[in-house]
């Protein structure tokens, strides 16, 4: 029996013009977009559609924008009936909306706060991230341990696919790794355009504030399992899910293990909902045999709704 997982991308997938094709052209999507505009304390639609002020790349804006786009696409799709859901980092919040753990309005407030806390935690230039290509996890982990000291750390942060491990930590060490990467055996080490050491233990500084903020919202049991970044398995209990979303701030994204867990459960079709095909590309490198569908635009939505 074929099983399906709906999956959602995280930061880095955003682009100017996102969701503009959906607005006023699909009632369900427009409802989500309008709701985001009413709920948030900044002009999210202008930021997503035209971004004249150049704010889309700031994490406190990127996070609600991506959640809103994925949720608008999701609302527009018919006959999905997924067995599981999974998101990459920020994308996990779209999974929580899809599985009815959080209402969209609550989720968009939470990711706005998450972005603000992340942005405030570190002055520009303190923390950063980089993608290490061509080395396995154990080797990257070993390099990180050898570079880290008592007052500066670098750690694996996103275990994306074989040969692609993202590291996170103090910018000085990230810069050192970028410089020394090839001599340490990597094909390349690419710095990422992020403003903080996300998914590293440095993010524990915002744990308390974030935890107390999300406690004010209603968390419900998931309608179908959410495969969580921190433990790479499906969860439905709202307390477990909520606790894992706090840990997610400072824990690595276990994307390889999460994908393999889903395949072990019989999933052979992954539907990526949101801008870009980043996750589909990663999954292809984990398992070439599964079916991949990408839903990014109004045209994709129409194609799905007409055929399924």
From Swiss-Prot:
Pfam families: Acyl_transf_1. InterPro entries: Ac_transferase_dom_sf (IPR001227), Acyl_transferase_dom (IPR014043), Acyl_Trfase/lysoPLipase (IPR016035), Mal-CoA-ACP_Trans/PKS_FabD (IPR050858), Malonyl_CoA-ACP_transAc (IPR024925), Malonyl_CoA-ACP_transAc_FabD (IPR004410), Malonyl_transacylase_ACP-bd (IPR016036). The active site is at 89, 199. It comes from the Bacteria. SUPFAM superfamilies: FabD/lysophospholipase-like, Probable ACP-binding domain of malonyl-CoA ACP transacylase. Keywords: Acyltransferase, Fatty acid biosynthesis, Fatty acid metabolism, Lipid biosynthesis, Lipid metabolism, Transferase. Signal peptide: none annotated. GO terms for biological process: fatty acid biosynthetic process. GO terms for cellular component: cytosol. Its EC number is 2.3.1.39. Belongs to the FabD family. This is Malonyl CoA-acyl carrier protein transacylase. It comes from Staphylococcus aureus (strain MSSA476). The gene is fabD.
């Amino acid at each position: 029996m074929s099983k399906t997982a709906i999956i959602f991308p995280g930061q880095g997938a955003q682009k100017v013009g996102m969701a503009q094709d959906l607005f006023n052209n699909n009632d369900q999507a427009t409802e989500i977009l309008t709701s985001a505009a009413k709920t948030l304390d900044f002009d999210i639609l202008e930021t997503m559609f035209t971004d004249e002020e150049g704010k889309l790349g700031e994490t406190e804006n990127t996070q609600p924008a991506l959640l809103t786009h994925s949720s608008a696409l999701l609302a527009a799709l018919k006959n999905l009936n997924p067995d599981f859901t999974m998101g990459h980092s920020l994308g996990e919040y779209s999974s929580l909306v899809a599985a009815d753990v959080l209402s969209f309005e609550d989720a968009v407030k939470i990711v706005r706060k998450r972005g603000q806390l992340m942005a405030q935690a570190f002055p520009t230039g303190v923390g950063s991230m980089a993608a290490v290509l061509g080395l396995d996890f154990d080797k990257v982990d070993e390099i990180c341990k050898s570079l880290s000291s008592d007052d500066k750390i670098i750690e694996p942060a996103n275990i994306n696919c074989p040969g692609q491990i993202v590291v996170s930590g103090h910018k000085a060490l990230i810069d050192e790794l970028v410089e020394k990467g090839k001599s340490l055996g990597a094909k390349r080490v690419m710095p990422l355009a992020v403003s903080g050491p996300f998914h590293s233990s440095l993010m524990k500084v915002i744990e308390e504030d974030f935890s107390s903020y999300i406690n004010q919202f209603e968390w419900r049991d998931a309608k179908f399992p959410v495969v969580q970044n921190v433990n790479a398995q499906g969860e439905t209990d709202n307390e477990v899910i909520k606790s894992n979303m706090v840990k997610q701030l400072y824990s690595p994204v276990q994307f390889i293990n999460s994908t393999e867990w889903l395949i072990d459960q019989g999933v052979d079709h992954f539907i990526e909902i949101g801008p870009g095909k980043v996750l589909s590309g990663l999954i292809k490198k984990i398992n070439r045999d599964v079916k991949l569908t990408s839903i990014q635009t109004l045209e994709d939505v129409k194609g799905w709704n007409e055929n399924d």
